[in-house]
């Protein structure tokens, strides 16, 4: 969608607010609904091109072969998701949650090499005031509903540029620079009409409050001064080791589980089955673990 430039609104981030809701991958999300139908493998939403006067907002969906046959229905689901955000999703608590996550990311970000930081700051100097070079990308001052509504009003079928990249498509032009074959065409009027007044998709709902977002970052005092991991549980077939950080002082913990079985890697066939099982488990749990991922857990 062509939209006005977001560059001068970095302190309130209305487009990032919309992107976080449309690109959510938890229960009730657009991606979860598309995935349940077998139509999509991935989805992302956010700013695309950003210039001084104009920009784009992009929703990118990785389609399955089946999804390629249901573009009209997928578009209807996309515009119903946009409608839900416009009607029910502009709420102060949602903005406060995004603000808290951004503060966490800024406060507890890992150190980078000085040369890397210098290059990043030099690039930002063209976009942000000097005093905001470090914090601009994480700054969320307040929810300005008019700004959010203004950007959502640009997300209409009439303002949509739909790009389809897939094998076997008919083309009638060749790009002069790269030799890529393509075709330009108007969207079918039936699609535009359906997307203009999308049917309500019962599988879609806005994200609930994220239970993994912390507010207390205080560290527990510990008398443990051991410099090496200590085995604190010893049972048949099970050992538990603990290592207390004495250097960084961050509210982070890391859990590592190693489950070993002779049947998991006994031969090539078992190894392949194990990898497939791991992929299936991760895919099945992704809807439940996504809120934790947003909060930096994982």
Region spans (language model):
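Mature, solvent-exposed C-terminal subdomains and processed small-chain segments of exported/organellar
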Residues: 1-298
């Amino acid at each position: 969608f062509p939209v006005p430039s977001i560059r001068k609104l970095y302190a309130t981030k209305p487009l990032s607010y919309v992107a976080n809701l449309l690109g959510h991958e938890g229960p009730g999300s657009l991606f979860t609904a598309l995935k349940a139908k077998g139509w999509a493998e991935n989805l992302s939403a956010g700013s695309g091109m950003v210039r001084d006067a104009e920009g784009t907002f992009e929703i990118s969906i990785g389609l399955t072969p089946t999804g390629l046959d249901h573009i009209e229905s997928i578009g209807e689901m996309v515009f119903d998701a946009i409608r839900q955000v416009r009607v029910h999703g502009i709420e102060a608590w949602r903005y406060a949650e995004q603000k808290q996550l951004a503060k966490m990311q800024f406060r507890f970000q890992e150190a980078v090499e000085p040369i890397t930081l210098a290059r990043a700051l030099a690039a930002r100097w063209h976009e942000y005031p000097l005093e905001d070079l470090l914090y601009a990308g994480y700054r969320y001052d307040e929810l300005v509903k008019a700004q959010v509504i203004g950007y959502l009003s640009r997300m209409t079928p009439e303002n949509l540029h739909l790009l389809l990249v897939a094998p076997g498509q008919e083309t009638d032009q060749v790009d002069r620079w790269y030799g890529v074959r393509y075709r330009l065409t108007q969207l079918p009027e039936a699609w535009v009409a359906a997307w203009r007044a999308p049917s309500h998709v019962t599988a879609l709902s806005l994200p609930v409050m994220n239970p993994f977002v912390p507010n207390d970052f205080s560290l527990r005092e510990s008398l443990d001064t051991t410099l090496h991991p200590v085995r604190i549980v010893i049972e048949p077939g099970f050992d538990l080791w603990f290592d207390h950080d004495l250097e960084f002082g961050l509210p982070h913990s890391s859990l590592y589980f190693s489950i070993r079985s002779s049947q998991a890697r006994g031969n090539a066939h078992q190894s392949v089955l194990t990898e497939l099982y791991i992929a299936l488990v991760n895919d099945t749990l992704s809807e439940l673990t996504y809120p934790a991922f947003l909060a930096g857990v994982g």
